[in-house]
Structure formats: C-alpha cells, structure tokens
Amino acid sequence: RIAFDICPVNIVLNYYVNSLGLEFDNEGLIAASGTIHNELLQELNSLQFYKMNPPKSLGLEWVQSTIFPLIDQKNMDIKDVLRTFVEHIAIQIGNSTKKCKDLFITGGGVFNSFLTQRIQQYSNSEISIPENQIVHFKEALIFSFLGLLRIDNQVNCLSSVTGATMDHSSGAIFLP
C-alpha cells in the first residue's frame, strides 16, 4: 500500500477565491471563465516536489513558501490564477493516477465540477464520487478509526505511506 500527497488543491483555490469575498468557487465557474497562463503552468508543473518519489507529503508551509510566491509574482486576475491552478491540479492528478483503473475522489474539490472535468481529461481512470455525507465526514471517520486502532495497540501508521522506518501505532491517549 502507498499513499502520498499529489498536489495542493483547495488550500490554493480557496485562498485566491477568498480575495473576491467568497468562501469557494462554486462549481468552478470562476476558474472556468479564466484563461490559462502557460508560463505559470509550466513553472508549477516543474516544481521539484513533483519529481520526488512517494511517500511524500505537503504542508501549508510549503504552499506559503513555494506556491503563493510563484503565483503572486505574476500579478494575474484571480479568474486566471484559478484557471491555471485547476489545470495544474488536473495534470498532476492525471500523472499520478495513470495506472489506476478507478479513481475515488473525495474532499471539497468534488463540489467543483469544472475541476472534476479537468481531472477526467488527464486521467485514464473511471472517476467515482461518494455521497455528500462521506465527503463531509470522511476525515472524522478516518481519524476515529485511527484512534480506535491506537486504543487497540494496532498499527495505524504504515511506513509505505509516511516514509517512517517501520509500521507502528501512533498517537497519544489521554484519559480523564
């Protein structure tokens, strides 16, 4: 088993759409109205992170120190930033899932139909999207399950996913 971060998605899209006074780009309509900035797209797709082998992971710090400055130096309209970044996301997900027959997409990005269409364009996979309840509560369910494994002293952290030297049971238990 292997898992890894492919690329940042909502953290970037929402950051830029927030500057328009919106929480998110509903259905990706703003991004769809923009134009791809090819130079920025090439720079994003050439970042060293995408050349690394998994396991690998991303954090807010990397986005703030790498992605935002790269985008901000271009002084683009927000709709063009969103359009370019959606294309970047779709390319990266497509590249990372080329060998996958099925692709199960979860998270807030599933509500961005333009993003999903662009991912489908670059992916050879059959895309499945779960019910809204699963999308909204996925992380709570996963972390509850990881907590249960920890309480039972079972492995909840796989080295193939995290890059750790061995599988282990991670987390702290605090009792009242």
What are these regions (language model features)?
Residues 146-157:
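Alpha-helix capping/hinge segments and adjacent helical runs
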Residues 100-119:
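Glycine-rich phosphate-binding loops at beta-strand->alpha-helix junctions
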Residues 5-6, 106, 130-138, 162-163:
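Active-site nucleophile and cofactor-binding loops and adjacent substrate-binding regions
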Residues 2-86, 90, 152, 162, ...:
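Conserved ATP-utilizing enzyme core subdomain
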Residues 120-142:
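Conserved phosphate-binding/catalytic loops in two-lobed NTP-binding clefts
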Residues 8-13, 85, 115, 136-139, ...:
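Catalytic-loop motifs flanking and including active-site residues across diverse enzymes
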Residues 93-101:
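Phosphate/pyrophosphate-binding loops at sites that engage ATP/ADP/AMP, CoA/4′-phosphopantetheine
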Residues 62-69, 114-124:
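Acidic-glycine-rich active-site phosphate/pyrophosphate-binding loop
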